[in-house]
Amino acid sequence: MALVNENYLKLPGSYLFSEIARRVNQFKKANPEADIIRLGIGDVTRPLVPAVVEAMKKAVDEMGRAETFRGYGPEQGYDFLIGQIIENDYKPRGIDLGMDEVFVSDGSKCDTANFQEILGIGNIVAVTDPVYPVYVDSNVMAGRSGAFNEKGQFDDIVYLPCTEANGMKPELPKTRVDMIYLCFPNNPTGMTLTKEELKQWVDYARENKSIILYDAAYEAFIQEAHIPRSIYEIEGAREVAVEFRSFSKTAGFTGTRCAFTVVPKEVMAYDREGRAYSLNGLWLRRQTTKFNGVSYPVQAAAAAIYTEAGKKQVKETIEYYMENARIIREGLVEAGYKVFGGVNAPYIWLKTPDNMSSWDFFDKLISVANVVGTPGAGFGASGEGYFRLTAFGTRENTVKALERIRTRM
């Protein structure tokens, strides 16, 4: 008799965005004429920039000629892309990385979910609340979560509330934790940490021999110079932090798939006798076993982001989305909503009016304004009573959606 992995049975009925899609489809079926504007799931609407498209076409042409064809590539990524990542994203900020400390992948969602595989099942996991669901669900699947309780949380996971009272910024755990998931700029709240605030987390991790799993997928959207773009700007972070980055939102790679993870050789985990093991080597071992690398045309396209033309074009795309964020944020404030985020991130986190639940606000928004967003409760218990809108729509739809919210809600 084949037994099921019972950890999967602890998961909520469906993934958040699958449930949203189900409800939207249900509404469309009942209202086929409705003009629905989607400001929910964080998919992009701007196309790949010309520099990226040209590089990908060139790479595809190379794959069609015997003398330039490439088969299996290195699991860790091609040196031409890794070198550009280090030279452009890290060196200008005074961060020195080795070529073997950067791992190219097909998405930061995959990496943030998979990285826990090389860490012990007995580790205590801490997540901010609200939180990107993947951090929690992947640890539930692995068996670190304990039971799902009546509060909508898992017994063995430490939740760090981000509330209006603490400015949507998590406080250090009261007890020791081993694995700390941080995402800044934050999904879903759109908030950021200063260097001083981030240093507290690095210091905590160093004191407790914890590991910070730092999701910096939205760093390219940071507008304020004093906000850190990498956790490695903080002294000592190389000893305790793994950083995840993505080209998905930065350069429109949601359908192309390319990201990278930085694992400094100094980051250690320990066995029961206290012997230290470098996570860099363990992650390499995991990747060479379970991952065949990102395709050559996609990596060539990603490298084009770092050309002079690519940088200029991607910057224009980011500015486009951040103008959308400004429109959403200012429009909601004018309409009387309490809002967070939208300054250094493409996400706007709003407080629902009149103590309305997140899902009730979702239903009202789609039925009255024909606008789709993401219920805060889907990101955790502390997200109840809040709602996320994204800046990844078209300008026309963003303006139209805010006008509907102002006049119909």
Curated annotation (Swiss-Prot):
CDD domains: AAT_like (cd00609). The keyword Transferase applies. It catalyses: (2S,6S)-2,6-diaminopimelate + 2-oxoglutarate = (S)-2,3,4,5-tetrahydrodipicolinate + L-glutamate + H2O + H(+). The modification N6-(pyridoxal phosphate)lysine is found at K249. Transmembrane segments: none annotated. Pyridoxal 5'-phosphate binds at Y72, S108, K109, Y132, N187, Y218, S246, F247, S248, R257, N292. Substrate binds at Y15, G42, K109, Y132, N187, N292, R388. Its EC number is 2.6.1.83. Pathway: Amino-acid biosynthesis; L-lysine biosynthesis via DAP pathway; LL-2,6-diaminopimelate from (S)-tetrahydrodipicolinate (aminotransferase route): step 1/1. GO terms for molecular function: L,L-diaminopimelate aminotransferase activity; pyridoxal phosphate binding. Keywords: Aminotransferase, Pyridoxal phosphate, Transferase. GO terms for biological process: lysine biosynthetic process via diaminopimelate, diaminopimelate-aminotransferase pathway. Homodimer. This is LL-diaminopimelate aminotransferase. It comes from Heliobacterium modesticaldum (strain ATCC 51547 / Ice1).
